[in-house]
């Protein structure tokens, strides 16, 4: 809908499905790096969004998403632990572009994310296992350098981006037989950089590709590389 000040407000919904599958290695049966088991987790999501855009290109983007979790974890000795639960995620993001050169703008961005995870208690055949997690808050400050060109009559948008992420202190707890408790702290600071391109093939069809690298800049040791490519349809 069009607002009195010329801004545009859009609302909608989306659905999603995610699947995680991996191996667990560690200090097991007296050996370091020995295979301990496998984990699988699937999530089905339903979300709502609202986006306010300014004629000059500024935006405010809000998202609420609810995810149903279903997991299957099993050890090399045949013990199993089914994981069921849900996740509530809320996000608000704002940005505003400033021209810096012909065909190029720089867009400072800020974002805050709230997330609450709830998992059902389970029994793995040896002990009762319960889960408890604090609400997690994550903040992001970043910037995107974006260009706009025309190739073969079609818009082409290359971009560079950089972000600083900080997850404020939160704790996950796993309790075995109502007595033994393992805690995991969430607090961390991470930086990432990325490059990407978007090519419009038609008013409602575009293709995109991106690559990102992220690394913790605190005492936590974590590094990751990501790549994405796809086709986007709008209607």
Residue ranges of predicted features:
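Membrane translocator/pore-forming domains, dominated by Gram-negative outer-membrane beta-barrels
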Residues: 1-235
């Amino acid at each position: 809908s069009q607002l009195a000040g010329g801004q545009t407000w859009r609302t909608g919904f989306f659905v999603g499905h995610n699947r995680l599958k991996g191996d667990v290695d560690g200090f097991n049966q007296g050996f370091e790096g020995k295979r301990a088991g496998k984990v699988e987790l699937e999530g089905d999501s339903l979300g709502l969004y609202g986006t306010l855009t300014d004629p000059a290109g500024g935006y405010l983007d809000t998202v609420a998403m609810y995810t149903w979790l279903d997991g299957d974890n099993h050890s090399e000795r045949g013990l199993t632990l089914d994981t069921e639960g849900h996740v509530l995620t809320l996000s608000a993001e704002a940005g505003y572009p400033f021209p810096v050169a012909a065909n190029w703008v720089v867009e400072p961005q800020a974002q805050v994310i709230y997330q609450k995870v709830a998992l059902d208690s389970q029994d793995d055949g040896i002990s009762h296992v319960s889960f408890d997690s604090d609400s997690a808050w994550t903040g992001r400050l970043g910037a995107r350098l974006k260009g706009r060109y025309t190739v073969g009559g079609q818009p082409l948008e290359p971009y560079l981006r950089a972000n600083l992420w900080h997850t404020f202190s939160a704790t996950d707890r796993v309790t075995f037989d109502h007595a033994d408790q393992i805690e995991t702290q969430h607090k961390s600071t991470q930086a990432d950089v990325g490059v990407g391109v978007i090519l419009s093939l038609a008013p409602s069809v575009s293709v995109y590709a991106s690559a990102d690298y992220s690394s913790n800049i605190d005492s936590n040791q974590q590094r990751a590389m990501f790549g994405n490519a796809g086709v986007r349809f709008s209607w």
